[in-house]
Amino acid sequence: TYRRDDSNLQKIVPGYYYRSDETGYTNGSGCGNEVASDRPMVQKLIVDSLIYWAKEYHIDGFRFDLMGVLDIDTMNVIAERLKEIRPDIYLYGEGWNGGPSSLAEEKRAFKASAKKMPGIGMFNDDIRDTIKGSVFYDDHLGFVNGGTHLENALRYGITGAVAHPQVDYDAYGSRPWAKEPGQSINYVSCHDNYTLWDKLSVSCPEASEEKKKAMNRLCAAIVFTSQG
């Protein structure tokens, strides 16, 4: 949450709504705190809020930032309750967290746990970085801007991170992470990091504008024709 020590949650029941360890608040969000979604009344607060927004405001989809901060059980309860209201509701999020968390790794709503959360989508950062290069390194190249030996990684992304006989999974923990293609949110850029054009410009400073336009079109073609 934006506030921590003086937040309404901390004032209601001090030490309950946030995770902590012997050093104080844990920081799975990267913002100084993380809600303890695995505790019954925290889960209830989250679920009840979502139900209210879905019923009263007719919201037809929810995106969960840093979904890895939340636990698998809570996400499954969310999906179950919201699909009772609207079976075609969209539920997806970032399948990672922003810092060290005290929540056991096997309980986190990570991308690696997607098969335990059917009907919930995850951003596919594998295809994002394969297409244009890592978002963390300016000069890192992807498939469209000159990167090499990326054919298998691209097939992995195009299939929507599900099992396929033409993909070698040894580089990905020997297994695909998605239960079904619909869990893979395919994208090449978003609100974080460089825009696609800026990434292509900084990674290929000698490329002409026409060349970068062609790269941009290839990025779109890959995303639009991938499963997911």
Could you say what each language-model-derived stretch is?
Residues 1-57, 67-86, 90:
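Substrate-binding/active-site clefts of carbohydrate-active enzymes
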